[in-house]
């Protein structure tokens, strides 16, 4: 009887240690994933600032992409990027 109780207590202790280790590993993976997402967001933000895309607002300091041109469309009071009837070269 004492052996069975000791075995159960020992098994519970092992499970507690394993679950603690698994939780720590899961938290580390979650932090790595969060850092990766933030890096991807930062990279996409810098790419988006290089040029304005179709129907994006444009000015002298915010140029349109190569295959777009900045035009004022009536009745819109600001300039937007529209297609200049060319295709980007790859």
From Swiss-Prot:
It comes from the Eukaryota. InterPro entries: Huwentoxin-1. Residues 1-19 form the signal peptide. GO terms for molecular function: ion channel inhibitor activity; toxin activity. Keywords: Disulfide bond, Ion channel impairing toxin, Knottin, Secreted, Signal, Toxin. One of its GO terms (cellular component) is extracellular region. Residues 20-50 form a propeptide. Disulfide bonds join 51-65, 58-70, 64-81. It is found in: Secreted. Its main location: secreted. Expressed by the venom gland. Ion channel inhibitor. Belongs to the neurotoxin 10 (Hwtx-1) family. 13 (Hntx-13) subfamily. The presence of a 'disulfide through disulfide knot' structurally defines this protein as a knottin. This is U7-theraphotoxin-Hhn1d.
